[in-house]
Amino acid sequence: MQIRRRPPNPAVEMGTLRYEVSVPESKPKNILEEIVWHKEKEVDYLRDKEPLVELRKKINLMPPPLDFLTTLSTGKTQLAVIAEVKKASPSKGVIRQDFEPVAIAKLYQENAATCISVLTDRKFFQGSFENLANIRENVDLPLLCKDFLIYPYQIYFARLYGADAVLLIAAILSDQDLKYFIKIVNSLGMTALVEVHTLKELDRVLGIEGVKLIGINNRNLEDFSVDLQTTFQLMEARKKELEKLGILVVSESGIHSYEDINFMINAGVNAVLVGESLVKKTNPGTALLQLFNENKS
């Protein structure tokens, strides 16, 4: 998958005037590209509002982040669980109308979640960094900032708001970007969850030094379709290499039932990331426990 970072806008100059010409290529090819183009504008705005040097000063005064990776490897359940606080998505719209992020996070913590993921993208997922900060103040579990990171600035911004880990999506980052971002994440004492969807992306990531945690996304970010076989196929192809390198693997998206959990155990992953199937239930905490209970009512 090739994602263009900015829309190509051919321009015609006439003297001191410059006219942008609309062409078919000026439109995003898929949802992921649309998100990335909007993220470019968002980061420009944030950097103007609060320069990186100011972020780093504030971060230096913060306590160190929690150890997301170690916590995942010592989960209390057969599979570690990253429970996600998520209000909406581009494919499903609003998932939960009475959305109270702190209350949901507390229910996760009370019901055996290993770590918590917080959607912070505002435009497409109706999340916010304020949600992340508020959850950080109210729960003790390590937090993953779930967003679309395309600049190092966003790593620092996530840390400032309480993130212990960040998501790095291989489909929107070059190898050079991934290497540099991972160095920054490590320098801040955080964890990088590097996300892949295809075998080609997985092989790219396996060749990058410093990767310790990989997420296999069962959701195709071009059209947001979901197939749990994605995890099974990638694990079947590269399980030995992953184990040899000591890399933990998280299966992300599309996990709704006890049967799905068993499927992932058999696939050989170390953890699952679950959001939508929990948030849409009346009690997300109870829903989390029921994922591991064959005799749920």
From Swiss-Prot:
Keyword terms: Amino-acid biosynthesis, Aromatic amino acid biosynthesis, Decarboxylase, Lyase, Tryptophan biosynthesis
Enzyme nomenclature, EC number: 4.1.1.48
Gene Ontology MF terms: indole-3-glycerol-phosphate synthase activity; phosphoribosylanthranilate isomerase activity
Pathway field: Amino-acid biosynthesis; L-tryptophan biosynthesis; L-tryptophan from chorismate: step 4/5
CDD domains hit by this protein: IGPS
Source domain of life: Bacteria
Pfam family, one: IGPS
Gene Ontology biological process terms, A to Z: L-tryptophan biosynthetic process
Record-linked Gene3D superfamilies: Aldolase class I
Substrates-to-products reaction catalysed: 1-(2-carboxyphenylamino)-1-deoxy-D-ribulose 5-phosphate + H(+) = (1S,2R)-1-C-(indol-3-yl)glycerol 3-phosphate + CO2 + H2O
HAMAP family recorded: IGPS_B (MF_00134_B)
Assigned protein family: Belongs to the TrpC family.
Descriptive protein name: Indole-3-glycerol phosphate synthase
Organism name: Trichodesmium erythraeum (strain IMS101)
Lineage: Bacteria, Bacillati, Cyanobacteriota, Cyanophyceae, Oscillatoriophycideae
